[in-house]
Structures are given as C-alpha cells and as structure tokens.
Amino acid sequence: MTEHEQKYAVRVTPSDKIRFRCTLCGACCRNVKETVPVDCKDAFYLTKHLRDLGMDIYCVDQLLEQYAEPALLDECGFFVYFLKSVGEDNACIFLKDNRCSVQEAKPLACRLYPFMVDPNGSGSFSYLYSTERTHHFRGAVVETRSWMKKHFSQESRAFMQAEYTQAGPIAALLMRIPEHRKTEAVLHFHRLRYSELDLDKPFLEQYQRNQMKLLAILSRMAEEG
C-alpha cells in the first residue's frame, strides 16, 4: 500500500458493509500521479489486453516504456512502477473520454477500489477502504467479503502473498551486493520480474519460476561480492 493510500485508509472486516456507488465521474482516475501501482501481474495482463486489441505492443517492456514510470522503493535498488499521469489534472494515462479504456484489464488497485488489501504474513489479508472521495459513499450497500470474492481472484491472492513473502529477502540480497555490481543486479531484477514474461503462457507459473531464478542470482552475486 502506498503512503497516499494509507492516508485515507480505514480498516474493515470481511463482514463489514459500506455504501458505495460508482458515479462515472472519473474522479478516482485524476490526480493520480505516482499513486496507481503497476506490478508485474498488472503489467502482464495490461500488455496482453492491449496486444489482443490490435495495438502495437508485444511485450511487457513496451507497455512499461509507454504507459508507466519507475520509482525507487529503496536505496538498495528495489523499484516499482506506477501508471503515468497526463495533463494538468494528472489523470491516468488510460482515462479516455472520462472512462477507463482498459476496463477489462485495469490494475488490481483500480479493480478493488474503494477497497484495499494488505497481506498480514499469516497467509490471509487485512481489508481497508479509501475515504478520499466522500461523494462515492452513497447508494447500495456493499459487503467487503462479497466485493473481494468478485474482484480479488485466487491468482491475485497467491501473487500478493508471494510478493509479500519474497520482497524482504530480495531487498536484503540487493543491499549486500557491492556498488560496482548494483547495475547488473538491478538489470536482473527487471529482466526476471518484467521482461521474461511470455504473454501466451500462464502468468503465475512464470512469475514463481522467475522469482526463484532471481533469488538464486542475487544470492550468488552477494556471496561473490
């Protein structure tokens, strides 16, 4: 969860209910500079979606170059991507005519809105919702559990737990790698988390395999010094 999300987050239980109605105002797609994360799973499905629509995009690296921007999460070299924002109102780059142009493949953060999830380390999740845009909280009653069942897939759950479990070890290894090899390590990080994803094969299997490769490479580099 980003610092921006934490600022407006209110914790809820699976059985809690809130009022929520999408008004198609586009407000949640504006003023989003560096607030919409695009993890490797999001990037995989966005790339596949745009390719299948006939756009000239055939790999995750192309998507990231055109539609996302990197942000350093830690000085060790661990970085993430956020969707680019455009215009004076810092609107999401995929907002067209006040509508999401990638609705079928939008990032998990957008899919879960107004809710958010936070892995708790025990294999389950804590749930929160964002109070940032108060005019959204009217209309029909929405139960947390039902919303998650609809929008938080088993694949997303498995991926998020793996990210939570492995981020620490990866960051620790990056910290141990000497400065003169840091660029090499970061290139491996990007290659195995983003570049080496085949759009025509299942995501999760590739992700898990690549993560193991990355941990092995970084571990060897840390030992070699």
PLM region spans:
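Short loop/turn segments that flank or connect secondary-structure elements
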Residues: 1-225
